[in-house]
From Swiss-Prot:
Record-linked InterPro entries: Cyt_P450 (IPR001128), Cyt_P450_CS (IPR017972), Cyt_P450_E_grp-IV (IPR002403), Cyt_P450_sf (IPR036396)
Taxonomic lineage of the native organism: Eukaryota, Fungi, Dikarya, Ascomycota, Pezizomycotina
Key words of the record: Glycoprotein, Heme, Iron, Membrane, Metal-binding, Monooxygenase, Oxidoreductase, Transmembrane, Transmembrane helix
Gene this chain is encoded by: ptmU
GO biological process: mycotoxin biosynthetic process
Species annotation: Penicillium ochrochloron
A single GO cellular-component term on record: membrane
Entry membrane topology: Single-pass membrane protein
Gene Ontology molecular function: heme binding; iron ion binding; monooxygenase activity; oxidoreductase activity, acting on paired donors, with incorporation or reduction of molecular oxygen
The name this protein goes by in its record: Cytochrome P450 monooxygenase ptmU
Sugar-modified residues: 98, 202, 398
Enzyme Commission code: 1.-.-.-
Keyword Repeat: no
Amino acid sequence: MSDVNAWWVGGSLLLGIWAIVVFFSPDPLAQYPVINSKRPGELFYTQSKIRFITQARSLLKEGLSKTNNAFRLVTNNRILLVLHSKYRNELRDHKSLNNTKPPEDDFFGWLQGFEPFNHVKTNPKVFAAMVRTKLTPSIGAVGIPLSEETDFVLQQQLTDSPEWHQINVKETSLQLVARLSARIFLGPQVCRNPAWIGIMINYTVEAFMTAERLRMWPRWLLWLVHWFLPSCKKLRSQVQEARGIISQVLQQRERNRKRAFLETEASDEVDTVQWLEDCAKGGYYDPALLQMGLAVVATHTSADLLSQVIFDLCEHPELLQPLREEIVTVITQHGWSKNAIYNLKLLDSVLKESQRLKPMQIISLYRYVTADITLSDGTLIPKGTYIAMIDDHSLDPNSSYTNGDRYDGYRFINMREVPERSHQTQLVSVSSDHTGFGFGNHACPGRFFAATELKIALCHLLLKYDLKLGDQKPQAMTYGFGLSSDPFTQISVRRRQEEISLAGSKS
């Protein structure tokens, strides 16, 4: 027998042994029922995935009715172990749960064009550290630039026309949030660069759609397939364009620093780019990919909440005048200081109520298990499992709040008077009853900035414009576990005379 034939025989034998071991090995998750498994006559999981995409909420309720600890769902990505919410406190900060691997795997972070989902290349710990140690303590310093940019964007997007005219709420919200975020993270020139704003808005949408197309192919073929899909080529082009823009920003900043040094003057830039370098402490991170990663996790989520609040206020116009009165009082007294953001309490309550009734996800604690976990009641979660947690409130709003299925803009401002729940009342507060910003150690570190950004945007919008719904009532869109504010419904707006000047209000 030749050496080549020997290699083929040996390789085939090893492959056969591996296949037998895999086929006959007991499934460590077999004790947990699969709620949307294949039905008789279904050879593949295609229909199971469709049922998940269209009926996820009812499947979660069915799972809860069949077990009191855990069950499995076939999702569009994988078979997922869904855990009862009673384990939330036990697992929320568990050292054997990884929160970066699931999105990286779901969105193919190892493929070119999907690098913003690659946690090694983006190093999200650098961004989280920058937000926690630099940006959040400096919230008071970003108020005026955010206000000035909001004034500029709204004049462009909504115009100064005193006549009623229609706008698409989602598109307007995306433009506003993208520009405001870029204003703080990259400066006044980049935030008005149409190419960069287009990347911030469009890359995420394109990545989500392309990921769905890739899931139709066997995973072992993706390294080849992605080179030929036009949408993958578009993603690679956007990443390359983003690198070019950020490279120019870094070069200009270096020139500014050298000039300031030669002139013995300090640079007047709000230096989030320098903050990132400081927090990296010499470690690797890619500035362009990090900024794109920020767009993925922040731009669409904040714009979605802003859109939902606008819709909710149009459906509850009785809130508009009290909100305007609060804004006038607070900004007159505090300007755009940190105290102002805190004292916009009714606006805070309205934001939190909108997030409560229409979160981005109806599950929480989406994690990858890095080592076997045995829970206090003996429930075993094997290493290598992907898990998620039931969010009781998303399935039944009345489970945690009185009249929880009804919108009440005053709900959380009234809860501030209830001692045992007062710590849960702010928009940035996280609890087991309200996981819009996550829960535990991995709660969104940027929520304080997001709250500031959204409040300033709404202050301008409410004082400068009248709002009203048309004949079409907005409907949230569902896709699997996801909920998105209506991307199609338009509202009517017209310019009104604001009671006070807002753009450059100082404390």
